[in-house]
Amino acid sequence: MPQQQQQRRMFTAALLALVFILAAVSTTEAGKKEKPEKKAKKSDCGEWQWSVCVPTNGDCGLGTREGTRTGAECKQTTKTQKCKIPCNWKKQFGAECKYQFQAWGECDLNTALKTRTGNLKRALHNADCQKTVTISKPCGKLTKPKPQESKKKKKEGKKQEKMLD
Protein backbone atom coordinates (compact mmCIF):
# COMPACT_ATOMS: atom_id res chain seq x y z
CA MET A 1 0.00 0.00 0.00
CA PRO A 2 2.67 2.55 0.83
CA GLN A 3 4.00 2.12 -2.69
CA GLN A 4 0.58 2.95 -4.20
CA GLN A 5 0.29 6.07 -2.06
CA GLN A 6 3.71 7.20 -3.18
CA GLN A 7 2.73 6.69 -6.85
CA ARG A 8 -0.51 8.68 -6.34
CA ARG A 9 1.42 11.55 -4.75
CA MET A 10 3.87 11.60 -7.67
CA PHE A 11 0.99 11.55 -10.16
CA THR A 12 -0.78 14.37 -8.29
CA ALA A 13 2.43 16.43 -8.17
CA ALA A 14 3.00 15.95 -11.89
CA LEU A 15 -0.60 16.89 -12.65
CA LEU A 16 -0.34 20.04 -10.50
CA ALA A 17 2.92 21.00 -12.22
CA LEU A 18 1.28 20.61 -15.62
CA VAL A 19 -1.70 22.78 -14.56
CA PHE A 20 0.69 25.40 -13.17
CA ILE A 21 2.69 25.51 -16.43
CA LEU A 22 -0.45 25.83 -18.56
CA ALA A 23 -1.74 28.65 -16.33
CA ALA A 24 1.56 30.49 -16.59
CA VAL A 25 1.63 30.23 -20.38
CA SER A 26 -1.96 31.43 -20.76
CA THR A 27 -1.38 34.48 -18.50
CA THR A 28 1.71 35.56 -20.44
CA GLU A 29 -0.16 35.28 -23.72
CA ALA A 30 -3.10 37.20 -22.29
CA GLY A 31 -0.75 39.92 -21.06
CA LYS A 32 0.56 40.56 -24.56
CA LYS A 33 -1.25 43.27 -26.40
CA GLU A 34 -2.08 42.52 -29.96
CA LYS A 35 -0.16 44.94 -32.09
CA PRO A 36 -2.04 46.33 -35.01
CA GLU A 37 -0.38 45.21 -38.23
CA LYS A 38 1.78 47.84 -39.80
CA LYS A 39 0.27 49.08 -42.98
CA ALA A 40 2.48 48.49 -45.95
CA LYS A 41 3.59 51.98 -46.86
CA LYS A 42 3.83 52.34 -50.58
CA SER A 43 6.66 54.58 -51.56
CA ASP A 44 5.91 57.46 -53.85
CA CYS A 45 9.55 57.40 -54.90
CA GLY A 46 10.51 56.25 -58.35
CA GLU A 47 13.38 53.98 -59.33
CA TRP A 48 16.91 55.36 -59.18
CA GLN A 49 18.23 56.49 -62.56
CA TRP A 50 22.02 56.47 -62.73
CA SER A 51 24.32 58.48 -64.97
CA VAL A 52 27.37 56.89 -66.55
CA CYS A 53 30.46 56.49 -64.41
CA VAL A 54 32.78 59.49 -64.76
CA PRO A 55 36.41 58.63 -63.91
CA THR A 56 38.22 60.93 -61.50
CA ASN A 57 41.49 60.76 -63.48
CA GLY A 58 41.95 59.74 -67.11
CA ASP A 59 39.45 57.53 -68.88
CA CYS A 60 39.35 54.55 -66.49
CA GLY A 61 39.72 53.66 -62.82
CA LEU A 62 37.80 55.07 -59.84
CA GLY A 63 35.09 57.64 -60.41
CA THR A 64 31.57 58.70 -59.43
CA ARG A 65 28.04 58.59 -60.87
CA GLU A 66 24.98 60.65 -60.03
CA GLY A 67 21.64 59.07 -59.20
CA THR A 68 18.23 60.76 -59.30
CA ARG A 69 14.66 59.70 -58.61
CA THR A 70 11.31 61.40 -58.56
CA GLY A 71 8.56 61.43 -55.97
CA ALA A 72 6.59 63.94 -53.92
CA GLU A 73 7.44 62.50 -50.49
CA CYS A 74 10.95 61.15 -51.17
CA LYS A 75 13.46 62.04 -48.50
CA GLN A 76 16.31 61.73 -50.97
CA THR A 77 16.02 62.53 -54.67
CA THR A 78 19.72 62.72 -55.62
CA LYS A 79 22.83 60.93 -54.48
CA THR A 80 26.38 60.27 -55.60
CA GLN A 81 27.88 56.80 -55.75
CA LYS A 82 31.46 55.61 -56.19
CA CYS A 83 32.11 53.48 -59.25
CA LYS A 84 34.98 51.95 -61.19
CA ILE A 85 35.65 51.62 -64.90
CA PRO A 86 37.99 48.69 -65.59
CA CYS A 87 40.93 49.85 -67.66
CA ASN A 88 40.97 46.76 -69.89
CA TRP A 89 37.42 47.21 -71.23
CA LYS A 90 36.88 48.30 -74.82
CA LYS A 91 35.92 51.91 -74.22
CA GLN A 92 34.76 52.49 -77.79
CA PHE A 93 31.58 50.54 -76.93
CA GLY A 94 30.94 52.39 -73.67
CA ALA A 95 32.72 52.03 -70.37
CA GLU A 96 29.61 50.46 -68.82
CA CYS A 97 29.40 47.61 -71.36
CA LYS A 98 31.45 44.39 -71.22
CA TYR A 99 31.65 42.09 -74.26
CA GLN A 100 32.86 38.54 -74.83
CA PHE A 101 34.79 38.49 -78.11
CA GLN A 102 35.29 35.61 -80.52
CA ALA A 103 38.62 34.83 -82.15
CA TRP A 104 39.88 37.09 -84.94
CA GLY A 105 38.62 36.12 -88.38
CA GLU A 106 40.69 35.60 -91.50
CA CYS A 107 42.28 38.60 -93.16
CA ASP A 108 40.15 40.19 -95.88
CA LEU A 109 42.63 40.78 -98.71
CA ASN A 110 40.43 43.51 -100.24
CA THR A 111 40.40 45.68 -97.11
CA ALA A 112 43.55 44.34 -95.40
CA LEU A 113 41.51 44.08 -92.19
CA LYS A 114 40.45 41.24 -89.95
CA THR A 115 37.34 41.44 -87.78
CA ARG A 116 35.77 39.81 -84.76
CA THR A 117 32.39 39.99 -83.08
CA GLY A 118 31.61 40.52 -79.41
CA ASN A 119 28.42 39.55 -77.59
CA LEU A 120 27.21 41.58 -74.62
CA LYS A 121 28.37 39.90 -71.42
CA ARG A 122 27.42 42.50 -68.80
CA ALA A 123 25.93 46.00 -68.65
CA LEU A 124 26.66 47.95 -65.48
CA HIS A 125 23.89 49.99 -63.86
CA ASN A 126 21.31 49.47 -66.59
CA ALA A 127 23.57 50.98 -69.23
CA ASP A 128 22.22 51.08 -72.77
CA CYS A 129 24.51 48.65 -74.61
CA GLN A 130 24.43 47.08 -78.06
CA LYS A 131 23.79 43.31 -78.01
CA THR A 132 26.60 42.60 -80.49
CA VAL A 133 29.52 44.70 -81.70
CA THR A 134 32.14 44.20 -84.40
CA ILE A 135 35.70 45.51 -84.36
CA SER A 136 38.37 45.50 -87.07
CA LYS A 137 42.13 45.84 -87.10
CA PRO A 138 44.83 45.78 -89.75
CA CYS A 139 46.03 42.34 -90.74
CA GLY A 140 49.67 43.15 -90.23
CA LYS A 141 52.44 41.81 -92.45
CA LEU A 142 51.31 39.37 -95.07
CA THR A 143 54.21 37.07 -95.78
CA LYS A 144 54.28 34.39 -98.40
CA PRO A 145 55.52 31.06 -97.15
CA LYS A 146 59.02 30.37 -98.48
CA PRO A 147 59.67 27.01 -100.05
CA GLN A 148 61.70 24.65 -97.88
CA GLU A 149 64.32 24.15 -100.59
CA SER A 150 65.66 27.68 -100.34
CA LYS A 151 66.21 27.34 -96.58
CA LYS A 152 68.11 24.10 -97.09
CA LYS A 153 70.32 25.71 -99.72
CA LYS A 154 71.15 28.62 -97.40
CA LYS A 155 72.12 26.24 -94.58
CA GLU A 156 74.26 24.19 -96.90
CA GLY A 157 75.94 27.33 -98.19
CA LYS A 158 76.80 28.45 -94.65
CA LYS A 159 78.21 25.02 -93.80
CA GLN A 160 80.46 25.12 -96.84
CA GLU A 161 81.67 28.62 -95.93
CA LYS A 162 82.61 27.43 -92.42
CA MET A 163 84.51 24.49 -93.85
CA LEU A 164 86.48 26.75 -96.14
CA ASP A 165 87.47 29.05 -93.29
Curated annotation (Swiss-Prot):
Residues 145-165 are annotated as: Chondroitin sulfate A binding. Keywords: Disulfide bond, Growth factor, Heparin-binding, Mitogen, Secreted, Signal. Residues 137-165 are annotated as: Disordered. Disulfide bonds join 45-74, 53-83, 60-87, 97-129, 107-139. InterPro entries: Midkine_heparin-bd_GF (IPR000762), PTN/MK_C_dom (IPR020090), PTN/MK_C_dom_sf (IPR038130), PTN/MK_diS_sf (IPR020091), PTN/MK_N_dom (IPR020089), PTN/MK_N_dom_sf (IPR037122), PTN_MK_heparin-bd_GF_CS (IPR020092). Residues 90-97, 121-129 are annotated as: Chondroitin sulfate binding. Residues 1-30 form the signal peptide. Its main location: secreted. GO terms for biological process: bone mineralization; brain development; cartilage development; dermatome development; heart development; learning; limb development; neural tube development. GO terms for molecular function: chondroitin sulfate binding; growth factor activity; heparin binding. It holds the Pfam family PTN_MK_N. It is found in: Secreted. One of its GO terms (cellular component) is extracellular region. Secreted growth factor that mediates its signal through cell-surface proteoglycan and non-proteoglycan receptors. Binds cell-surface proteoglycan receptor via their chondroitin sulfate (CS) groups. Thereby regulates many processes like cell proliferation, cell survival, cell growth, cell differentiation and cell migration. Belongs to the pleiotrophin family. This is Pleiotrophin. It comes from Gallus gallus.
